[in-house]
């Protein structure tokens, strides 16, 4: 997309043609510099971003979301989760497993999840996430280093797949 096309149709999603400003993404990374870069870059691309550096805070957010025991269906506020794999105390894989447990207990589907990972962690993640080679289509892997333009395209694609 050229600069002129961006000016004529700001925040247009090439995948669906919809405005991406309606898409809300939770970004989780313990490295505050990377978190800030991702937040600024993705917001600059038109996404609404909630950024967290502490995975335990993220768990609290999801406990609140999935703890809604009213008659009304749970409204998931996030279209996608972007989670770093390597975090101290609670890594991205463990965080994802906890979020999926909370969702299962609430009888809802969690949002799609994209992991940010260094290439050498790839097979370790696959082994931990997909035991017995049972693939989870709601999870994608994004390799470092990250280029915001490529990341934006990938996230729009992942969101479109799950709409």
Map each language-model feature to its residues.
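Active-site residues of response regulator receiver
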Residues: 84
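Hydrophobic/aromatic residues positioned on beta-strands within the core alpha/beta folds
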Residues: 114-117
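Non-catalytic signal-transmission and effector/linker regions of two-component phosphorelay proteins
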Residues: 1-26, 32-39, 63-77, 106-109, ...
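Residue-level signal for the "D+5" position in two-component response regulator receiver
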Residues: 51, 89-90
């Amino acid at each position: 997309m050229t600069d002129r096309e961006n000016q004529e149709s700001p925040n247009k999603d090439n995948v669906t043609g919809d405005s991406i400003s309606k898409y809300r993404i939770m970004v989780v990374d313990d490295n505050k510099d990377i978190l800030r870069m991702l937040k600024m870059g993705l917001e600059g691309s038109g996404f609404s971003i909630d950024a967290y550096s502490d995975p335990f805070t993220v768990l609290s957010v999801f406990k609140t979301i999935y703890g809604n025991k009213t008659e009304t269906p749970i409204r998931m506020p996030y279209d996608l989760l972007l989670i770093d794999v390597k975090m101290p105390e609670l890594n991205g894989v463990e965080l994802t497993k906890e979020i999926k447990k909370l969702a299962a207990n609430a009888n809802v589907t969690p949002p799609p999840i994209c992991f940010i990972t260094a290439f050498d962690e790839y097979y370790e993640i696959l082994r931990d996430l997909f035991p017995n080679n049972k693939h989870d289509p709601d999870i994608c892997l994004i390799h470092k280093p990250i280029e915001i333009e490529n990341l934006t395209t990938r996230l729009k694609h992942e969101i479109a797949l799950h709409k």
